[in-house]
A protein has these predicted regions:
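A conserved acidic beta->alpha catalytic loop
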Residues: 169-184, 199-205
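Cell-envelope/extracellular polymer assembly enzymes that use nucleotide-activated donors
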Residues: 131-135, 165, 344
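Catalytic donor-sugar/metal-binding loop of nucleotide-sugar-dependent glycosyltransferases
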Residues: 347-363
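Short, acidic, metal-binding catalytic loop of nucleotide-sugar glycosyltransferases
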Residues: 150-163
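Short beta-strand-to-loop acidic/aromatic patch adjacent to the donor-nucleotide binding site
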Residues: 233-248
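Juxtamembrane C-terminal module of membrane proteins
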Residues: 2-52, 62, 89-131, 394, ...
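Active-site donor/metal-binding and catalytic loop motifs
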Residues: 359-373
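Long helical/loop segments within the catalytic core of UDP-sugar-dependent glycosyltransferases
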Residues: 189, 206-232, 249-339, 371, ...
């Protein structure tokens, strides 16, 4: 078992980043470590900008959610409001259909990738294979079975055992996790290469997964430089997964093949390098909780699969990130912070001139969650989904390169703000349109029978005039009803077909028949999951609101039990 003394890290509670004070960091100002400026004006400007950037995500969401009510009730002419309504409904259904079409293409590619012998193909090409160092940061892991299944998935990889080293990363003070880890390591001893990396945290102010990964990355880099870590013929790559991640047997071989293809294309396009991110989905091992609603099993996975067909960078949350060890060192590892370090790493990579490319093969998370735990899990995902403050404050390392406009900091910051606002927007704005339309007098014009709480009673009027003054308002009500109903029916047919073979592994034999029926039933009747989408939207608003009010959002509930 290796042990490594953590380097001194400087940070404050208001920072998003804590960085080691080593020689390599010299000459580069930290992304948000406060450096006392000589003048009071500069200090006030820095503090004010920081608070504005913390408020910006919440403000962006509120502004976008208030556009339609303001257009409808503040203007004398309701026509602009109806144009906005028609445009958003068209965008909403168009986005859904495009994602479904793209997801179908991704589905075919994923199913194909899971069946091909990629190692045999690499050997047929006589391609030199890379040595993969698989980082698994551990924190408060009390379920030995979850750890064992993760280790077993690594053991089953169809890749030379000598070129796979599993490196669990653990804080020296985390005795409970260390005890569980020792039990699992003893079980797999002799069957795979495992090097446990333990480091003390007495001088580490920001104790998080990013700190663990960065500390281990520097330790591994030093070992490589000293010749203590043998590389493969194709070099050394780092793969980062979570403690509950299951890898497909073809993962490393397909990853190596994809790395070579993407890097060849990157060189032709003038990109510095490539980071791969695999599709994040979930297994059927949460069969213990029948009919369990999981947000990621429908909308989020569908969105991920759609994004895999885009030409842009694949900035999606999840384990399964891999890159060359030299690239990992060049971008100075992860950024320890109180938000989501995965997303900060990906944004940093893009701004430094690298590409984040999708790996069209799934990694499965195996943790069962109760409905109560879902709030903590979704709030944890929402917490840093995007950190515009990090993007604005970050200072690039490679300033001598001319990057595309799409990779620039202003564009990435705007992208971050919009991405942060999209979950509440796509859930709450359709609900807002429905509610407002049902208190409109237009309902009387298109509904054949009187409805509960007559529109004449609930209708809001402006200067004595009805708000339903155009045929477009009537058309929008019909159009909205048809679109939202058809999207539900479309989801009942397409989503189960698209996701079921990718999300689920086989449940235990004694549960197989009943579980198959329950899973299909839950996926087909997608309205059952509507409350989960509202849970996602409110969790995002809750997190943004705490950040805007200056309240701490550091705490991450441990949901993997």
């Amino acid at each position: 078992m290796s042990s490594h003394r953590a380097e001194e890290i400087e940070a404050s509670d208001t920072c998003t980043v804590a960085r080691p004070a080593d020689g390599k960091s010299a000459g580069r100002a930290d992304a948000s470590v406060p450096i006392s400026p000589p003048r009071l004006g500069m200090r006030l400007w820095s503090a004010g900008l920081g608070r504005l950037l913390e408020i910006a995500p919440f403000l962006t969401t509120l502004v976008l959610l208030s556009v339609y009510p303001m257009l409808r009730y503040l203007l004398r002419d309701p026509f602009p409001a109806e144009v906005f309504r028609f445009g958003f409904i068209s965008f909403w259904i168009g986005f859904l259909i495009v994602n479904m079409v793209r997801a179908q293409k991704t589905r075919q590619a994923i199913l194909h990738a899971m069946e091909v012998d990629w190692l045999g193909r690499l050997r047929g090409l006589q391609a030199p294979l890379s040595h993969y160092a698989i980082f698994i940061p551990l924190k408060n892991e009390t379920n030995r079975h979850v750890l064992y299944r993760t280790f077993r998935s690594v053991e089953r990889l169809q890749y030379p055992k000598s070129l796979v080293t599993l490196i669990p990363i653990i804080e020296a003070e985390d005795r409970v996790t260390l005890e569980k880890l020792d039990e699992v390591v003893r079980q797999v001893a002799g069957r795979m290469q495992v090097e446990v990396f333990s480091y003390p945290t007495d001088r580490v102010p920001v104790k998080c997964k990013a700190t663990s990964i960065s500390t281990c990355g520097r330790w591994l880099t030093a070992r490589i430089a000293n010749g203590d870590f043998a590389g493969g013929p194709g070099g050394i790559r780092v793969l980062i997964i979570d403690a509950d991640t299951l890898l497909h047997p073809q993962d490393l071989a397909f990853r190596e093949y994809t790395h070579r293809e993407e890097e060849a294309q990157a060189a032709a396009r003038g990109v510095r390098g490539v980071v791969l991110q695999s599709l994040t989905t979930y297994t059927a091992n949460y069969w213990k909780v029948p009919m369990l609603p999981r947000l990621h099993n429908t909308g989020f996975v569908l969105y991920q699969m759609g994004k895999m067909q885009s030409r842009g960078d694949y900035l999606v949350l999840g384990p399964g990130t891999s890159m060359d060890v030299g690239l990992f060192e060049a971008v100075d590892y992860f950024e320890p912070n109180r938000h989501n370090e995965d997303m900060q790493f990906r944004y940093k990579v893009v701004m430094e001139g690298y590409r984040v490319a999708p790996l069209k093969i799934p990694t499965w998370g195996q943790a069962p969650l109760s409905t109560q735990d879902s709030w903590g899990q979704i709030a944890r995902w929402a917490r840093g989904a995007v950190d515009a403050k990090f993007i604005v404050a970050y200072r690039q390392r490679f300033r001598d390169r001319r990057l595309p406009i799409a990779n620039s900091k202003p564009v990435q910051a705007l992208r971050a703000l919009l991405a942060n606002a999209m979950p509440p927007l796509t859930v709450l704005l359709p609900a807002q349109l429905i509610l407002i339309s049902w208190i409109s007098p237009c309902v009387r014009d298109v509904w054949p029978t009187p409805v509960f709480l007559s529109p004449d009673v609930l209708a809001l009027k402006h200067a004595g005039r009805s708000l339903c003054v155009s045929t477009m308002a009537v058309f929008n009500l019909v159009f909205q009803t048809i679109v939202l109903t058809s999207s539900t029916l479309l989801g009942m047919v397409v989503v189960p077909y698209t996701l079921k073979p990718i999300i689920y592994q086989r449940p235990p034999r004694r549960w197989r028949r009943g579980r198959t029926f329950l899973e299909w039933f839950r996926l087909v009747f997608t309205p059952i999951n509507l409350h989960n989408y509202f849970l996602m939207a409110t969790a995002q608003l809750y997190t943004q609101g705490k950040l805007a009010l200056g309240l701490p959002i550091t705490h991450t509930p441990v949901t993997r039990k």
